[in-house]
Amino acid sequence: MTKYTVAVAGATGYAGGEALRILAAHPAFEVTAVAGHSSIGHRLGEYQPHIPQLADLIVEDTTPAVLDGHDVIVLALPHGASGALAAQLDDDAVVVDLGADHRLERQQAWDDYYGGDFYQHWTYGMPELILGIGSDGKYVRQRDELTGAKRIAGPGCNVTATTLALQPAIAQGLVDTKSIVADLAVGYSGAGKNLKRTNLLASEAMGSASPYSVGGTHRHIPEIRQNFAHAAGLGASQADMFSLAFTPILVPMSRGILASVSAKLTDEALALTDEQIHDIWVQAYEGQEFIFVLDPGVMPATQNVLGSNAAHVQVAVDRRSGTLHAFTAIDNLNRGTAGQAIESLNIAFGLNDATGLSKIGVAP
């Protein structure tokens, strides 16, 4: 198998570390350069000791001179840091941005939630994203857009969980799009590796749960609404059709997301049986090898997907309130970030989607 060289920027963080962990065992990719900021000149093993195969790589400065010359460049940088850098990179390289700089299609959405310079939207790296239903009655998917892509925007982790939970309902018109509520239990690694008051002391973090970015302020909201618009077969300009009350909650686990997403069912959808509604999810993810729709009544659990690129999905109906409840469990660093990015890279290079990726979680 041909080996493609890879440079990873942001190599000492959580997202960069997970990308390196997966790439270290990937049969088609070889990590030959790592870059950082405060870690320049140090061995990678000082920061990512769980990857002994790459321990002797020296962290270099995050510059085009270091990153160029590789077949693949992975940018695991905070939002606002990758946009200007990416504009200077070699056009021949395949670049995947794990940050937010190239996810949003509308500048107004960027200005409202991020601010600063707005950068060009890249090919969106969620292969299973539904883009409406074709004239043949089959789901159109983002996967086809990724074949041969040179610039890939990795989705947000919360975005991934929320989108995978509800997009079948959006595509089939089952719910009132002004009634969507998403509550997510999120592990601490989702907040990044920088020290914060909320996660600095184990004595305060463990055994405690706390919401954050409440009141419609979380930066993943416009991206989720953008995805819902696409699932309905609409453009990003129609994202305002979707109202989303979104609340993430930090819970005392190192990684993982459990998304609970609800919306009012339409009268037509209420006429369907629970089995018919469950079957819509089964059909929506048929052939999507990383998405597992669980048997009726079996609820997703973060423990069952840790370390994998899998997503476990379930749907239930509350007949008394006329509400649909959809659930997704993912590993935020793998399926939610690095694993999904490498799945997209596999597609871009014409490899099997699952090359170098696991569908099996770690238990206990």
Swiss-Prot record:
Query: Which SMART domains does the UniProt entry name for this protein?
Result: Semialdhyde_dh (SM00859)
Catalyses which reaction? N-acetyl-L-glutamate 5-semialdehyde + phosphate + NADP(+) = N-acetyl-L-glutamyl 5-phosphate + NADPH + H(+)
Recorded GO CC terms: cytoplasm
Keyword flag Amino-acid biosynthesis? yes
- Alphabetical list of CDD domains matching this protein: AGPR_1_actinobacAGPR_like, AGPR_1_C
Which of the seven top EC classes does this enzyme belong to? oxidoreductase
Catalytic positions are: C157
Entry EC no(s): 1.2.1.38
Keywords, A to Z, come to:
Amino-acid biosynthesis, Arginine biosynthesis, Cytoplasm, NADP, Oxidoreductase
| Biochemical pathway | Amino-acid biosynthesis; L-arginine biosynthesis; N(2)-acetyl-L-ornithine from L-glutamate: step 3/4
* Family annotation (InterPro entries): AGPR_AS (IPR023013), AGPR_type-1 (IPR000706), NAD(P)-bd_dom_sf (IPR036291), NAGSA_dehydrogenase (IPR050085), Semialdehyde_DH_NAD-bd (IPR000534)
Q: Which SUPFAM superfamilies match?
A: Glyceraldehyde-3-phosphate dehydrogenase-like, C-terminal domain, NAD(P)-binding Rossmann-fold domains
Where does the protein end up? Cytoplasm
Please provide the Gene Ontology terms (biological process) for this protein: L-arginine biosynthetic process
Q: Which GO terms describe its molecular function?
A: N-acetyl-gamma-glutamyl-phosphate reductase activity; NAD binding; NADP+ binding
Pfam families in alphabetical order: Semialdhyde_dh, Semialdhyde_dhC_1
Functional description taken from the UniProt entry: Catalyzes the NADPH-dependent reduction of N-acetyl-5-glutamyl phosphate to yield N-acetyl-L-glutamate 5-semialdehyde.
Q: Which HAMAP family would you find in this protein's record?
A: ArgC_type1 (MF_00150)
Q: Which family does it belong to?
A: Belongs to the NAGSA dehydrogenase family. Type 1 subfamily.
Query: What name appears for this protein in its UniProt entry?
Result: N-acetyl-gamma-glutamyl-phosphate reductase
Organism of origin is Bifidobacterium animalis subsp. lactis (strain AD011)
